[in-house]
């Protein structure tokens, strides 16, 4: 091999190593159990930009993206220490929120409120009570409102995990 070929080969090897390192999962606070990682991989096989963080007493939250790079969809999935999925929160553009959900909001006491952001969050829960959460401004106050698929519009609920 010529000297130039050796340099090119070395540069390619370094570049490949950097790409592999950049695509690896990132772990905060240690590494989740194999059960947790396996359940996540089963549920979200195409996930990328994956970052794990311990949450509470041995539970885990994983932030990740799906879809086309570089502008994927942001998600956060929550797992208990045994690898059981608890909930996933997905960022959704307001334009992509189903019309019936928007209608429920417009027919509620929050009809005069303005959207604070250009997106909402979609919560999928283990119990199946899925809902959209909106950040609104009403009467000069910031409020969060949940709208479920049955048309119930309520102030934001907390404590799912």
Which stretches of residues belong to each language-model region?
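Bacterial signal peptide processing site
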Residues: 25-28
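Bacterial N-terminal signal peptides that target proteins for export
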Residues: 1-11
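Repetitive helical segments and hydrophobic/amphipathic motifs
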Residues: 15-16
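First exposed extracellular module after export/assembly in secreted or surface-exposed proteins
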Residues: 2, 31-161
């Amino acid at each position: 091999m010529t000297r130039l070929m050796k340099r090119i080969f070395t540069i390619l090897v370094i570049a490949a190593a950097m790409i592999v390192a950049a695509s690896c999962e990132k772990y905060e606070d240690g590494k989740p159990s194999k059960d947790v990682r396996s359940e996540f991989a089963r549920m979200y096989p195409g996930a990328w930009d994956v970052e794990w963080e311990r949450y509470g007493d041995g539970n885990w939250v994983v932030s990740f993206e799906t879809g086309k790079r570089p502008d994927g969809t942001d998600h956060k999935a929550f797992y208990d220490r045994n690898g059981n999925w608890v909930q996933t929160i997905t960022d959704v553009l307001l334009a992509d929120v189903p019309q019936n959900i928007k209608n429920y909001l417009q027919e509620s006491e929050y009809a005069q409120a303005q959207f604070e952001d250009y997106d909402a969050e979609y919560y999928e829960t283990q119990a199946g009570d899925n809902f959209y959460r909106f950040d609104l401004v009403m009467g000069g106050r910031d409020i969060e409102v949940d709208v479920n698929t049955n048309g119930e519009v309520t102030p934001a609920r907390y404590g799912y995990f």
